[in-house]
A protein has these predicted regions:
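Intrinsically disordered, low-complexity, positively biased terminal segments
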Residues: 1-3, 54-58, 62-64, 89, ...
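Hydrophobic adenine-recognition pocket in adenosine-nucleotide-binding enzymes
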Residues: 8, 85-87
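Surface-exposed beta-loop interaction hotspot
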Residues: 133, 142-168
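Short coil/loop residues immediately preceding or within conserved phosphate-binding loops
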Residues: 56, 68, 77, 82, ...
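Conserved catalytic-core motifs of GNAT/GCN5-like acyltransferases
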Residues: 78, 117-121, 137-150, 260-272
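Conserved GNAT-fold acetyl-CoA-binding loop/helix
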Residues: 21-46, 167-188
Length: 285
């Protein structure tokens, strides 16, 4: 029987969380990589938050009246991010994932998104093949890094909490580096107290919504990025996502005791500019 798709509701969070936990656990365990979610309850809490967030679109797939998968779309910018997408392990490779992906891609296009992006676990061959067949192009190899906080400071690079008055400068910086801003994400992070900025010679030269799995960072130089990583009190979730091609910062992280948890790949449809600075994505883009 073909699946039916409908918008996600708050009542779906627990079941979607269970499926998400089991789906990611089965893939991670099969490839001997650490799990993304420590428990079904954590996954349900995350998905429940996305369902209720006005900046996200959620969709669930049902068969015979039972939820068998879900997908989400971050719509807070002109570039949108997909995920997490998860399918009941008993129904994987049966077209449910493709249907959920097509749904959010159609949603993004109907709303005029300039670009559509996602991060793919590099060891997962099937998802790489699926996303490529749907039109996504591999753009950037990434390494998920984790370890103890570095507690490092750099003279002349001052890191402090971001405030609402910093938003315009941070948005302009993001536009310079990426060609668009992520102002709604930044505003949310400032409100939550997780956003930080780095200042050099009296100017904001970098910001982060958190050195974490679900946070992004934009900087003018590698030294700005190192200052933000060095000042982080923790690395939230499985770790932070560093472009592996940034050899200077990648090697510096390894030399300071951080370790690679697993590799990922940034994939895109539509607008993509080679970033003109140092940066780190969220697990969505």
């Amino acid at each position: 029987m073909a699946e039916t798709l409908r918008p996600a509701t708050a009542a779906d969070a627990v079941e979607c969380g269970r499926i998400c936990f089991e789906a990611f656990a089965s893939i991670c365990d099969a490839h001997n990589f650490p799990r993304d979610f420590p428990s079904p309850e954590i996954a349900a809490g995350l998905l429940g938050g996305l369902i209720l967030h006005p900046g996200f679109y959620g969709v669930v797939a049902e068969r015979d009246g039972k939820i068998v998968g879900s997908n989400f779309l971050d719509e807070r910018s002109i570039v949108v991010g997909i995920g997490p997408v998860s399918i009941d392990p008993a129904l994987q490779n049966k077209g449910v994932g493709r249907a959920l992906m097509r749904d959010v891609i159609a949603r993004a296009r109907s709303r005029g998104a300039a670009g559509i992006r996602l991060l793919q676990a590099t060891y997962h061959n099937r998802s790489l093949s699926l996303y490529t067949s749907l039109g996504f192009q591999a753009r950037e190899p990434l390494s998920v890094l984790q370890g103890k906080p570095l507690n490092l400071r750099f003279p002349g690079y001052d890191v402090r909490p971001a405030t609402a008055t910093d938003a315009a400068a941070c948005d302009a910086l993001c536009h310079d580096v990426h060609g668009f801003d992520r102002g709604k994400e930044l505003t949310g992070a400032i409100g939550q107290g997780s956003a930080m900025v780095v200042e050099h010679q009296g100017q904001i030269t970098g910001y982060t919504t958190g050195i974490a799995f679900f946070a992004h960072t934009v900087c003018r130089t590698n030294r700005d990025l190192q200052a933000l990583i060095g000042a982080a009190s923790e690395f939230g979730g499985p770790g932070f996502l560093l472009p592996t091609r940034n050899h200077e910062v990648f090697a510096w992280c390894l030399a300071n005791g951080l370790r690679v948890a697993y590799p990922m790949t940034l994939m895109t449809i539509g607008l993509y500019n080679e970033p003109a600075g140092a940066w780190m994505p969220t697990v969505l883009y």
